[in-house]
């Protein structure tokens, strides 16, 4: 199942997340890059992403792209990253039509989640 379908199924298709913040993170950090397409610019996506990432102690960055998509590069426990994705999908202002994902090697030297311009 692709990531976009997984997110929709996990939220029950109604944009209300059914998952909660995990009690304990997995011990091994992972880093992923996500490209979100749809109505994701001009709707506060970057600020919501930063807030959700901060709540989950995730690090990385988010940036608008010239093609109208938004790229998020995020690092932390895999189950916390899943909770981040559920939180993003639950925001009703966003109309996410596609998510592309790429696994990256962890950097392990970032200390915060930033908005890049």
Please provide the spans of the model-predicted regions.
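Intrinsically disordered, low-complexity, mixed-charge
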Residues: 1-117
